[in-house]
């Protein structure tokens, strides 16, 4: 559900604006995706940093009946899971560009890879690392969700690039 929400938000915002700029020029379309990428990365770093620091204070509010050790586990798991929205956000961004070029199959396949990552977490990571292994499986799934789309995105010629300018 979280993945679908990210995808819907990204595609609702990005696809029409990207296509509008693409009709103007490829350069304008590239500028747009690079600007969106920069805004996304800055926002994510800011939000993740604040959340990471705040988690020990937030955990008792969300799991008030848990003992201290369990609350620490919740904090640890949540901190691991903070990586996942980064990959899923980039994946939603990638899929928006791909869908602009009417490439739908790769996004559909990416959902399978997301689940494969979670299954790997359950089968491989949990026996080795315990419950945090499940969180790492979710992170792996979100990474696979993004990475599977990258080759198709490169072929479009519109792979986003982060360029730092003065």
What are these model-derived regions, one by one?
Residues 1-166:
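Membrane-embedded alpha-helical bundles of multi-pass transporters/translocases
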